Design a protein with these regions (language model features):
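Tryptophan-centered motif/residue detector
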Residues: 184, 211, 249, 256-257, ...
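Conserved beta-strand scaffold positions in the cores of enzyme catalytic domains, especially
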Residues: 200, 238-239, 298-301
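Rossmann-like nucleotide/phosphate-binding core characteristic of flavoprotein oxidoreductases
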Residues: 1-148
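Glycine-rich active-site loop/strand segments that organize a redox cofactor
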Residues: 17-18, 22-25, 32, 185-227, ...
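Feature captures the FAD/FMN-dependent oxidoreductase FAD-binding
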Residues: 63-112, 117-122, 213-282
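Rossmann-like dinucleotide-binding core of oxidoreductases
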Residues: 138-145, 149-166, 170-180, 185, ...
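N-terminal cofactor/phosphate-binding cores enriched in small/glycine residues
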Residues: 159-161, 165-182, 189-194, 212-214, ...
Length: 354
């Protein structure tokens, strides 16, 4: 289809044959939702062709080739009519229809609570419709004197910063590392990537149209958060290479007294009216103490503190744990190691993806 800027309505000018060829690689369940929108045919949601409950990475709904052909034919007719009638989009489906479409897509009943979120994600309603309502009656002159300190410049800390900027509330971010991005700055082990679809692992108001993979790798994610911080002018509010060592609430002054340690070890302090902890849940690696470990002569490292200066080529390597990091790390290490041993406490929960 003809490319335009994100968020701008796209017009179809391609021939029937080109459209048909494009449909061969499209997700069939997604096509069915597009047909419902373009034609208003909600009977499709109650028809015989239905996707099965999806698993990670499966985008065709486990439909057979005959069913796929039927849907592609319907989609071709819908797109031809849309093109020939001037590419005028019909009204967006209402909340009840969206809910029915959601149930259809996932093969089970989706709780009502998810509908408003999904409609916002698809820009069918105003984004963040309640943003700012909590401080709407507070004069700007009062807001500008309310100081907020955010601990951490990962994805949560950056989001908090942007929201505070929008509300006219001053802030500072204290970040222990040398860059933004949190876990995507610190984690550098081989194969490091997100295990959630990339377009979900981004801010709803700041989608990226540059993801090169469904499950983006670490460098791409880090670049996304760096661009976000630069675009929104957050960097100038960040104190890098500084760690929060203590925070004490002063009831009399209604302020937080925050103790800091700089890159050279110098201790300083700051005062804030509000304190936001955005340190994340896994920002400090937990390394088990194993009996006899002191006698081990080889290299020992945690995946969260990967040492790129250590070569694993031709080595006998042991990996302890089979969590998400191991899923990504082990296949990469196996390419270099002479022998690889994996020790697990519990069976893995991921399905093979040949």
């Amino acid at each position: 289809m003809s490319a335009t800027q994100p968020g701008v309505e796209q017009r179809i000018v391609e021939s029937d044959d080109v459209i048909a060829a494009m449909l061969e690689s499209a997700s069939i369940p997604t096509l069915m939702m597009s047909i419902v929108h373009l034609t208003g045919r909600t009977d499709i949601l109650r028809g015989a062709i239905r996707p099965k409950t999806p698993l990670m990475g499966e985008v065709q709904g486990y439909l057979d080739e005959k069913e796929k052909a039927v849907v592609r034919a319907l989609a071709l007719e819908a797109l031809k009519a849309y093109r020939d009638n001037g590419c005028v989009l019909p009204p967006a489906p209402d909340a009840a229809t969206i809910h029915e479409m959601m149930n259809f897509m996932v093969g089970e009943t989706v709780p009502d609570d998810y509908v408003p979120m999904m409609m916002e994600e698809m820009s069918l309603v105003a984004r963040d419709s309640e943003a700012g309502s909590a401080v709407a009656d507070i004069p700007a002159s009062v807001r500008k004197d309310f100081q907020v300190l955010i601990i951490g410049a990962g994805m949560s800390g950056l989001l908090a910063a942007v929201r505070l900027q929008e509300l006219g509330i001053p802030y500072v971010i204290i970040e222990k590392s040398a860059s933004v991005g949190g876990t995507w700055h610190e984690n550098r082990y081989p194969g490091c990537r997100v295990d959630i679809a990339s377009h979900f692992y981004s801010y709803s108001f700041e989608p990226s149209h540059e993801w090169t993979q469904l499950y983006a790798k670490r460098d791409e994610l880090w670049a996304y958060f760096k661009r976000f911080a630069e675009k929104h002018g957050v960097l100038q509010h960040i104190q890098f290479n500084t760690e929060v060592t203590a925070a004490t609430w002063d009831e009399g002054n209604a302020t937080w007294n925050v103790e800091l340690r700089g890159p050279d070890g110098t201790a300083t302090s700051r005062t804030a009216n509000a304190l936001i902890s955005a340190v994340g849940q896994l920002n400090r690696p937990s390394t088990p103490q194993i009996p006899g470990q002191a006698a081990f002569k080889g290299e020992v490292m945690h995946s969260a503190e990967w040492r790129s200066d250590v070569s694993l080529v031709g080595k006998r390597v042991a990996v302890i744990g089979t969590g998400a990091s191991a899923f990504q790390l082990v296949p990469e290490v196996a390419k270099e190691a002479a022998q690889l041993f994996v020790f697990q406490r519990s069976p893995v929960w991921m399905l093979p993806n040949p």
